[in-house]
Structures are given as structure tokens and as C-alpha cells.
Amino acid sequence: MSTVFATEASRVCKRIDAVRRKDSLVFPIFTDPHTHTLTEDGMENLFAALASLANTIKPDGVIALGDNLAMLGRECHATNDEIAGLLRGIFDRCAAMFACPVYPVNGNHDGIGTDFFKPDFWYAVSRAYDQNTAVREGESAYYYVDFPGVRMVCLSLPSDSELAAEHPTPAWEYGDAQLRWLAHTALACDCPVLLVMHVPFYYEYLGDPVPMLGTWNGTHATESTIAALCGWIADRDVAKEIFAAFQNHTVYDNAAVGIHMAPSGARACLIAALSGHMHNDSFWLPGEKRNTGDVESGGTNALPCAQFVTASSNPAVNPDLRGHETVPATLDIAVVTPCERTITLVRYGDGEDRMWHW
């Protein structure tokens, strides 16, 4: 098995070298392992894949796109300490392999009881791995990082849950505080911005939430409700308007949320959005519409930039790959090159490289 990883790492390193320039930023990306333990095959293979690259690609950061955990808290009992310990175990392994920071973003499975998310819980887990390079809003789960010529903005979605409410919300929203931070702080820059978030921005709830919200009780819900609610982003239109104003260098005001956003600088633009969540690959052009009636594969890219969705690092979770993979782990390595205005996702494992010129 070690030969498989070494051979794949050699191929990937040659591909990275072919597109890398002096100003390129390099980020290994993994997402959606959905593990119960650190020793399951999917995690062992992920760690082996990362280790095969650790001494060769010299990355600027490792991006963990979320949904590290399986259905802990619903499939089986798991305490908050156990959930936090498993998350720390994953990030500890990554940090031990690479000299660079690790940048985790939370998925809907990475919180207390899963699908419920408290930002202070995630902050306490994730802040130890960014090597003090991330700029956060208090103890937030969202943050930005400045690199030479590029800002990376890591969003939290889900952002918060009101567990004490009679009918708790499933937390699929950015929330007013995060949206104000996005407009006033994270996008207050005059440089290209790389967006990072677990849930793709095109993916949205297609039905009527009112009857389903009434079934929520504490941290538990029926399986059908979970399936239907995944992807419903209640305040996505406000986020869309913020991104459009940033891209078009215009003023944006939203009194209801408390936003007055000044025009962005002349060099400001969106590079692309990086996401996971779907378990298989996809690539979306700005404004692209696809199978809009299908919650699994359809939607509209409402962002004025391309969106890359990275497949699960565990091929057993990927419906397009399960059972016929040739490499037992899947990664993307993002190569962001400001001088050429390109972002290339080099594939480690089964799948194709993808490139966008912003």
C-alpha cells in the first residue's frame, strides 16, 4: 500500500511543479472523511496520503473543509469531550506532518450532536492550529488569513444554533454577526480573495421549511427532516449581495442587518470558492445553473466567481467512486498564482485536475 501513496505523490508533485510560480500559494485540501475514530481505514489512508506529500510540496497551509466526523451524537452516543478529542486528533496529525498552519472550517457534522453548531465550541478546538495567522472576530468560527497578494476568507456554515428555543433552528445560516464581519472586515481589502466554506454556495433548500422546523426537538430530528434541511441557507441572498458588491466595487447597504459596505479597491476580486459537503466533485462557472430541480446535483452558482467542490477524502463516501477507486484517498492541492490570475486544483487520487482563470 505504501508504494501506491509514494507513486501517486511523485506524480502529483511533478504536476504541482509544472504550474507553480514564484508567487504561488499551495494548499492541500481534504474534506468529508466522516469518521468515527482515528483508526478507521478512511482516516489511515488520508493520513498516509498527506504524509506522502509532507516533505515535498512545501505548502502555505493545509485546508480542512469540514465534516470530519460521522453522525456522532445521532448514530451513537458521543460526549462533547469525545467529539472535541476526535477533531483535535485529526488536526494534531496534520500539524505534526506539516510545518505550515492548518486551517479548519466547520462542517455540519463537526459540532455538538452534529448538525447543531456552537461557534465557541469550534473556536476552542480549531484555534490551536493556525499558528496565530488567522484574524478572528472574538471567539468566532469564521476568520481571514492574509498571504502575499491574497486574502483567504474562511466562513462558518452552519454558524450557530439556538438549542434553548422551543423549535430550534437547524443552523443553516451565516447569521447577522458573520455577515456584518464579512462586509465590514473580511472584504475590506484591496486584493484578490479566496473563499473557503464547507457548504457550496449553490446548494440550497428546495422545499417549505415551516412544517419541518416544527419537528425539531433538542439535538434530534427525523432522518427525513435532516435530509431535506441539508443545504438550506436562510440568509444566502444577503451574502450573495455582499459578494456582488465586492466584485463590482459598489456600495452595499442593508439596514436590517446593520451593513454599510464601502466600495472595494480596484484590485479587489473573488478568486474562487472552495467547498466540500457533497462527497463528489463538481466545478461551477460564475452564474451557472444546473439541474435546478435536483437537490443532490442541481442548483445555481449565485457567486460572481467559480466554485470548486472537492470530493470526500474517503472514496467509500463518494457515490461516484465507491468500490472502484485506484488510490485509497482523495485530496486536492490548490495552487493559487496571483501573477497569472489562476487557481489550479491538482488531484491526488482518482479524478481530474481543474483550473480557473479569475
Regions picked out by a protein language model, each given a short descriptive name:
Residues 38-42, 73-84, 114-120, 164-170, ...:
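Short, flexible/disordered intra-domain loops and linkers
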Residues 5-15, 74-187, 248, 266, ...:
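Extended active-site neighborhood of metal-dependent phosphoesterases/phosphodiesterases
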Residues 51-61, 96, 151-153, 165-289:
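His/acidic metal-ligating clusters that form di-metal
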Residues 35, 69-70, 110, 201, ...:
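Short active-site segment of divalent metal-dependent hydrolases/proteases
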Residues 1-81:
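N-terminal active-site segment of His-dependent metallophosphoesterases
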Residues 32, 66-67, 107-108, 198, ...:
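Active-site glycine-centered loops adjacent to acidic/histidine catalytic or metal-binding residues
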Residues 338-358:
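Acidic, His/Gly-rich catalytic cores of divalent-metal-dependent hydrolytic chemistry
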